[in-house]
């Protein structure tokens, strides 16, 4: 399968501070990659590298020519005194036609919000509107920066269900950034745990294997949420230095 974006041994420094070190990944059509990591781990920098907004100091980046990217930001800041409906907000995107708006909203099951004030939307509704905005670009790559932030568990399940549906319909690659170090979308194809470098990677463990989780969130939640178990051979000290775990040597 041809990758839309591939990074090979990419490193980024800001001044004397190394933010990313030897990071490699591939984003392929129809595949979901979830990026996990603590605050300050370099997740936002890595997203900017993928988007072409930050050039690496070392390593190789390959992108499909004329790649169309849809981006959903982590937060949306709006002036609460500014009268702005969902319709007007979406039309602010350059190149958007009036006739594109309602179909995009309907695609994310948010057609009923077209005349709603942006400031009155719930967290889940806001994420759907931002997702509709990203779809206006007919993306080959969908980048979602912490899409479930501020959304309750039921909203997360519905959002993950929608993301899975969209990646199948569009056959697009999905890069999802998560602040939750353990709970991820079950249908993620690969999880990368980042702390300036890739600490570990693998597939999420499907939540259906955890009866106590199903009893808490129901069978539908079990289908859409997964637990990722980290397998690190090291830890990071307070200065960010790598310390190998016992049995793996010392540093």
Curated annotation (Swiss-Prot):
Part of the ABC transporter complex ZnuABC involved in zinc import. Responsible for energy coupling to the transport system. PANTHER family: METAL TRANSPORT SYSTEM ATP-BINDING PROTEIN TM_0124-RELATED, ZINC IMPORT ATP-BINDING PROTEIN ZNUC. The complex is composed of two ATP-binding proteins (ZnuC), two transmembrane proteins (ZnuB) and a solute-binding protein (ZnuA). Belongs to the ABC transporter superfamily. Zinc importer (TC 3.A.1.15.5) family. ATP binds at residues 37-44. It is a peripheral membrane protein. This is Zinc import ATP-binding protein ZnuC. It is found in: Cell inner membrane.
């Amino acid at each position: 399968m041809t990758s839309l974006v591939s990074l090979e041994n990419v490193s980024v420094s800001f001044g004397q501070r190394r933010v990313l070190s030897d990071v490699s990944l591939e984003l392929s059509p129809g595949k979901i990659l979830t990026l996990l990591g603590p605050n300050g781990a370099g997740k936002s920098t890595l997203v900017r590298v993928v988007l072409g907004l930050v050039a690496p100091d070392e390593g190789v980046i390959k992108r499909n020519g004329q790649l169309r990217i849809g981006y959903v930001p982590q937060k949306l800041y709006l002036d609460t005194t500014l009268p702005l409906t969902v319709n007007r907000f979406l039309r602010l995107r350059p190149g958007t036609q009036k006739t594109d708006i309602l179909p995009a909203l309907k695609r994310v099951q948010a057609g009923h919000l077209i005349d709603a004030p942006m400031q009155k939307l719930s967290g889940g509704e806001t994420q759907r509107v931002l997702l509709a905005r990203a779809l206006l670009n007919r993306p080959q790559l969908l980048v979602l920066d912490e899409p479930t932030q501020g959304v309750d568990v039921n909203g997360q399940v519905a959002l993950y269900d929608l993301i899975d549906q969209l990646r199948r319909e569009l056959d697009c690659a999905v890069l999802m950034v998560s602040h939750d170090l353990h709970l991820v979308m079950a249908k993620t194809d690969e999880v990368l745990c980042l702390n300036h470098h890739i600490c570990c990677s693998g597939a999420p463990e499907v939540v259906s294997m955890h009866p106590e989780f199903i009893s808490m969130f129901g069978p539908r939640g079990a289908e859409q949420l997964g637990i990722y178990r980290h397998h690190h051979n090291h830890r990071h000290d307070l200065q960010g230095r790598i310390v190998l775990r016992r049995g793996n040597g010392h540093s």
